[in-house]
Design a protein with these regions (language model features):
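Glycine-rich, flexible N-terminal cofactor/catalytic loop recognition
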Residues: 1-55, 151, 262-318
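A contiguous loop/helix-start segment that scaffolds small-molecule binding in enzyme catalytic cores
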Residues: 2-4, 60, 71-75, 131, ...
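Short glycine-rich anion-binding loops that position phosphate/pyrophosphate groups of nucleotides
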Residues: 9-12, 35, 80-84, 139-140, ...
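Short, acidic/turn-prone active-site loops that include or flank metal/cofactor-
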Residues: 9-10, 34-36, 52-59, 109-111, ...
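Class I SAM-dependent methyltransferase SAM-binding "motif I" and its flanking Rossmann-like core
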Residues: 11, 84-155, 198-201, 280, ...
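Short, solvent-exposed amphipathic alpha-helical segments in soluble enzyme
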Residues: 18-22, 44-47, 92-95, 149-152, ...
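General beta-strand structural signal in soluble alpha/beta enzymes
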Residues: 31-33, 52, 76-80, 103-108, ...
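Short phosphate-binding loop-to-helix
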Residues: 56-70, 88, 323-340, 351
Length: 365
């Protein structure tokens, strides 16, 4: 069996629980040596054979996989981030299909999620942008004209741009030609979640100068759009008591007093906003699992709390009805003020339609 595994954006503890389990069980590991944190290789079992695919062609990779298949060995093909983004996995899967080799995919945390975490931002701010465009500049791999930077820039959505750090002068020109003003907020994030992570806030017009000043020439993502500033947004309807959802009925009125009454925060405990992944707990990262384990208090919807209780039965749990999200945020801050480390848990990634924005809003107020 071949497992195509996303290693996460860089930090060793951002591989998922499932990905780590598969890595530990593998007889053979083929990893993207130029991008995957080599520290993950310490998790392989004794006797595992490790190949660095940065020095291999597709044909050489497939020779290793085919031989392992014949010998009934478990293979992990370890890709950076999430394999579905710029991972070149389709050609590998096509080759395995022709050979009759079975495989599966273990998703990973993409570097664009790590980038949002590094910037402490939410990509999808109400009233500013509800869409994220993930793209790249044309290089040795061409980009269709309909998907050019200039075409996408006309949408004025949040843009996360991969594989383009060496072309920032041209990138700025294309962004402005597409409609972004020169002073549109932008950010450069170098090696998101790695120990050497670096974040630079700048503008569309000054991308190249900012990168040169900080000596950033590769391995960085570019974020463009008014969401980078993280201000001027509308209140989220998702957590507004006056808004009806499938899970709750609207309250008759909403005074806004919960937000305005939040006291000045001088927290002595730590507050973590933790994305639990897409579903089952083996989709959670080691970092997320550790953050929850390190906290005395866990706050969240009852359904999420029930998922983690079997693993953390001795924690203090804060669960409120679905009309009381802001109250739960306030209670979490109050626990921090009492010196208790607190985890606010939510599904998926906390920065994409998640709790991070509401926690930020309540905290600021």
């Amino acid at each position: 069996m071949v497992h195509i595994v996303g290693a996460g954006p860089g930090a060793e503890d951002l591989i998922t629980v499932r990905g780590l389990r598969l890595l530990k069980q593998a007889d053979i590991v083929i990893y993207a040596g130029s991008l995957v944190n080599p520290g993950l290789l310490k998790e392989t079992k004794q006797g595992a054979v490790i190949y660095d695919s940065a020095k291999m062609t597709l044909e050489q990779v497939m020779e290793v996989i085919e031989q392992a298949w014949k010998e009934q060995k478990e293979v992990v093909r370890l890709h950076t981030g999430d394999p579905c983004l710029y991972g070149a996995i389709r050609e590998q899967m096509d080759a395995m299909d022709k050979l009759g080799i079975t495989y599966d995919i273990c998703p990973g945390v993409s570097s664009f999620c790590g980038t949002a975490a590094a910037l402490q931002m939410e990509y999808t701010l109400p009233g500013i942008s509800q869409s994220v465009i993930i793209t790249r500049m044309a290089g040795r791999t061409p980009v269709p004209e309909r998907e050019s930077i200039r075409q996408f820039a006309s949408h004025q959505a949040t843009m996360v741009i991969f594989l383009s750090t060496g072309m920032l002068k041209e990138l700025s020109k294309e962004l402005m030609a597409g409609g972004y003003s020169p002073d549109t907020p932008a950010a450069i994030v170098y090696k998101a979640t790695w120990p050497e992570e670096k974040t630079v806030r700048t503008t569309v017009a000054e991308l190249a100068e900012a990168a040169e000043r900080e000596h950033i020439t590769k391995t960085a993502l570019i974020v463009v759009g008014n969401t980078v500033a993280q201000n001027g947004y509308d209140r989220s309807k998702l957590y507004d008591p006056g808004f009806t959802t499938e899970f709750r009925m609207a309250e008759s009125s909403h005074s806004g007093k919960i937000v305005s009454a939040v006291p000045e925060i001088a927290a002595s405990g730590k507050l973590y906003v933790v994305g639990m992944g897409p579903g089952s707990l083996d989709g959670m990262t080691k970092e997320a699992f550790k953050a929850i384990g390190d906290c005395q208090v866990i706050a969240g919807y009852t359904v999420y709390a029930d998922l983690v209780k079997p693993y953390f039965p001795d924690k203090e749990y804060l669960t409120t009805p679905m009309t009381k999200e802001e109250a739960r945020c306030r209670m979490a801050f109050e626990c921090c003020m009492e010196g208790k480390d607190t985890a606010m848990i939510c599904s998926g990634d906390s920065g994409v339609y998640g709790m991070a924005g509401l926690m930020y809003e309540v905290g600021v107020n």
